[in-house]
């Protein structure tokens, strides 16, 4: 494991991942999930459909396989739930940006199967396996699967609790 700090590369990669997050979140959460919710479709079905489409956006990524596709679906659920309950794209955009940026340019993992030339840390994994995600990167790992499920459940729990409280509190006019 090595360390190198290259501010220009870090800033450039941050801008790149910001553009990726903006594009994907505006399209998948802002437009597609927003339109599905506007049809009065069940919010969880809308969330699942938009998440499946998000995963399909990545179908041609290098090293794609079943577990990375599952994790991309779960990532879509996490990002979608954060939009669903905050009603604001800033949270999923920020989450998406920092998720990708920290994985690749900071920690040195592949991001959705894509390798980046420069990272702060250089990881030398003993072998590619389902625990470290192999050639797809951390998003291809079982650890990622567990994290996505846990954090999605937490966001849904928080959001449902928040909605229940807001419905129970009478508004004064």
Residue ranges and their predicted role:
Residues 1-26, 33-39, 168, 173:
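Juxtamembrane helix-loop-helix connectors linking adjacent transmembrane helices
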Residues 1-4, 57-66:
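Membrane-interface helix caps and helix-loop-helix hairpins in membrane proteins
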Residues 9, 13, 43-47, 68, ...:
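Residue-level signature of transmembrane alpha-helical entry/exit and packing/kink sites
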Residues 17, 43-59, 72-73:
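Small-polar-interrupted transmembrane alpha-helices in polytopic inner-membrane proteins
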Residues 23-49, 81-88:
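Membrane-interface helix/loop boundary segments of multi-pass membrane proteins
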Residues 27-36, 65, 94-95, 103:
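Active-site-flanking alpha-helical
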Residues 68-129:
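Functionally important transmembrane alpha-helices
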Residues 102-173:
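C-terminal membrane module of polytopic membrane proteins
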